Structure formats: structure tokens, C-alpha cells
């Protein structure tokens, strides 16, 4: 069967990370999924199609505009997929537990207190569940960040440049993530640094 909601081919940034996420995710029809920092729905739409009507996907993003855009794209399709506004660092304790928690390019937004945010997130994972997060770790994509910084400088975006440089300076490493997950008591912790091609225009 041809998927109706594949990962978008025209997104050179989110899709490569989402492909890695799907490669690592052990997803079954009927699973319940919490997708954090869902953005424009990559890979929430794809996840919802995979779990089917017996499952559920709650996709959370802090930006109201992103949520409205994703709902507009969804229309009446896949009613078991729900987009909601929320801060993944401070999710309400009334949320249920999920079989899977995913976050594509989300871990970078946990700053400044990543361990505390991760600890809050893990409490929503069912026993035996799986957490899969993708993020550009320390020492990766440095040539890309230089290009972004140069473009921001050209546009006089000094506030944005400052925020970017703060992020670059305090990026977590893969070992940081592994240590934090183990401290939180997760089992079978696997941290992979996967080479990705992110196309840029010079």
C-alpha cells in the first residue's frame, strides 16, 4: 500500500533527521505516541498513519501558528492524530502515558535545563516503552552554522545571532544524552551519531 503521508521530500532539514528517527523507532499499529516539538508535522503525520485508527498520536508544539498550520493540513484526516499547543518542558501531569515518545530535532529546545526537561518527559513513558529523540549534537553541522551566522549578519539579525551562538556553545554531546538517560533509569540506552547530508546553498 502506498503511504498517503510519507515524509516530505522537499524538507532538506527535518526529513533526514525524521528518517533516522523512524529507522530507530519500534512502532506497531495501535501504539500511542507523544510527539514533542512537532512543528509542521514532520514526522507526526507519518507516525499517525503507521499506528492507524487503533492507535493515537498527540503532537505538541509551543507555537500556536505551527499547530494551526498542521491542523489545516490535517483537515478531517486521521482523527486519531491530535495537534495541541504546549511546552514540552512543562507538560501537564494529567497527560496519559504513551508507548512511544518521539522528538525530531527537539532536544535542542530543552535548553537551558535539559536534564530536568528530559526527566519530566520520561514520566509519560509507559513501562517497556521507547523514547527516540534526534538532534544535532556538539561538533556537528559546524559548517552549516557558519553559513547561518553569516546570513544573519548580512541581514543585521543581531539578536538571532546571539541566540544561535549561545545554542552552539552549549550544545549537548551524544555522551551527555546517554549519561542523562541512564541516570533517569532507562534501559537499553542507545546513542547513535549518524552521518547525514544536509544540502546548503553557498
Regions found by a protein language model. Name each.
Residues 32-91:
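Class I SAM-dependent methyltransferase SAM/SAH-binding core
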Residues 12-31, 46:
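Conserved alpha-helix/loop element of class I SAM-dependent methyltransferases that forms part
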Residues 1-12:
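Class I SAM-dependent methyltransferase Rossmann-like catalytic core
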